[in-house]
């Protein structure tokens, strides 16, 4: 799910799907129910702005398999913008949306799935997690017996938990004999590089990112290829054009094959088409291949339109992908039309009023954008309310309506300041910073 790390928390409304019967009121309540009923708890960390969540809601979290799963678990749909759920995201080190995280009746994490999946893959992975075989404690016990497959499993689990430092620290506790032979195992070697990539990203170490990402990309990483290549593209931005091309050019052939065989096919193996397309566009742009950049974006646009058959509401994931492709392609006229259609398609949602209003304000059209932001503000709350207010303030200040801007900040501070103090502080500072 490209560029969907939780640091970018924008929007939220009514959940796209729900479990059967009455749902627990909170994660704490879900855990208590799971313990009481001796059932695992499955938490879906999502948000209404999350395009990958749209995909899962429409294509995966429904039907017989979903009904069967709900009878086996206590399900809770966590809202990334609600203070209580956000606190749990921090506690559990959840950085990616959606994340599906299972916790056993005893409180031990059973495993987690990051990002969207094709239907069959999701239910297969969930089944494995609920069996208990993916518990970190079990994996470590198996690794202690000398299983290199278990060593790789442990490292992969730390990677899914965004715990690069902890994973490498655990690896260093293994007997020297195991560590010395581990690099001969392709899975272990790849898992180690993925943890080193996490550490380099945490440290904002571009050289470390380039080194680790290049090694990871040399492995069989399936649907994660766009995300890792995106890391590499980003880490080379500061390099001279020739040096950057030398680092990125070797990735083009493998990535073109990935697009042709796993994304642009009738039955894609990888569900996240958006990340695949945007990473391709960024790669081609970095290589100076303007024609390739334009072509892959237009292919994404045309395929989205073809599958939607003129009905945006038939698939929100596809509709939102179309919007983002048009943004990236700078197709302003098409985008203006589409965003208004999206607002009409989801009238109870502040998402598209916000996106359209923000884009107008950023484009210097404060007077045109403000009404859309005001419409969004009526439906926004939590972290989203602060984000919408930020652009309301920007628009009002551009229109020399500073008194109204102060009223927006005051109202937002009163409603959300206690739950989101850092974000509200930045909002307050926006009253005096250069607009």
Could you tell me what each predicted segment is?
Residues 151-158, 174, 192-199, 228-235, ...:
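Structural register within alpha-helical repeat arrays
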Residues 140-143, 174-190, 215-226, 243-245, ...:
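Flexible helix-coil transition and linker loops at the boundaries of alpha-helical arrays
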Residues 161-165, 199-203, 239, 287, ...:
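Structural motif corresponding to the intra-repeat A-B loop/turn of tetratricopeptide repeats
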Residues 275, 317, 351, 385-387:
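Start-of-helix register in tetratricopeptide repeats
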Residues 20-25, 45-47, 60-85, 94:
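Thiol-based oxidoreductase modules, predominantly thioredoxin-like and allied folds used
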Residues 61, 94-135:
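Non-catalytic, surface beta->alpha helical segment in thiol-disulfide oxidoreductase systems
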């Amino acid at each position: 799910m490209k560029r969907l790390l939780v640091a970018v928390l924008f929007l939220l409304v009514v959940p796209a799907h729900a479990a059967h019967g009455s749902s627990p009121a909170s994660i704490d309540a879900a855990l208590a129910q799971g313990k009481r009923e001796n059932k695992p708890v499955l938490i879906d960390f999502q948000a209404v702005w999350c395009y990958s969540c749209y995909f899962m809601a429409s294509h995966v979290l429904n039907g017989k398999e979903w009904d069967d799963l709900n009878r086996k678990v206590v399900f809770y749909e966590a809202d990334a913008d609600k203070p209580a759920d956000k606190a749990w995201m921090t506690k559990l080190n959840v950085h990616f949306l959606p994340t599906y995280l299972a916790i056993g009746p005893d409180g031990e994490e059973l495993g987690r799935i990051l990002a969207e999946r094709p239907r069959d893959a999701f239910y297969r992975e969930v089944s494995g997690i609920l069996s208990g075989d993916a518990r970190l404690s079990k994996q470590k016990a198996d690794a202690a017996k000398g299983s290199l497959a278990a060593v790789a499993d442990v490292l992969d689990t730390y990677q899914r938990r965004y715990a690069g430092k902890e994973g490498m620290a655990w690896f260093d506790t293994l007997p020297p004999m195991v560590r010395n032979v581990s690099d001969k195992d392709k899975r272990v070697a790849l898992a180690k590089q993925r943890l080193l990539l996490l550490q380099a990203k945490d440290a904002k170490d571009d050289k470390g990112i380039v080194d680790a990402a290049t090694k990871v990309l040399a492995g069989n990483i399936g649907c994660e290829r766009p995300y890792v290549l995106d890391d590499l593209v980003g880490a080379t931005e500061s390099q001279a054009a020739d040096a950057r091309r030398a680092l990125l050019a070797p990735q083009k052939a493998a990535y073109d094959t990935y697009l042709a065989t796993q994304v642009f096919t009738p039955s894609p193996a990888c569900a996240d088409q958006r990340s695949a397309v945007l990473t391709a566009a960024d790669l081609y742009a970095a290589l100076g291949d303007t024609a390739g950049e334009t072509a892959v974006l237009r292919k994404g646009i045309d395929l989205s339109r073809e599958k939607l058959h003129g009905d945006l509401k038939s698939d929100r994931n596809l509709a939102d992908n179309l919007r983002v492709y048009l943004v990236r392609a700078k197709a302003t006229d098409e985008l203006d039309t589409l965003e208004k259609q999206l607002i009409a398609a989801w009238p109870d949602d502040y998402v598209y009023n916000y996106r359209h209003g923000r884009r107008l304000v950023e484009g210097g059209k404060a007077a045109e954008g403000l009404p859309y932001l005001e419409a969004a503000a009526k439906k926004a709350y939590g972290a989203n309310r602060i984000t919408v207010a930020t652009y309301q303030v920007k628009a009002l200040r551009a229109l020399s309506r500073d008194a109204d801007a102060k009223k927006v900040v005051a109202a937002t501070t009163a409603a959300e300041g206690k739950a989101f103090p850092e974000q509200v502080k930045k909002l307050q500072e926006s009253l005096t910073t250069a607009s």
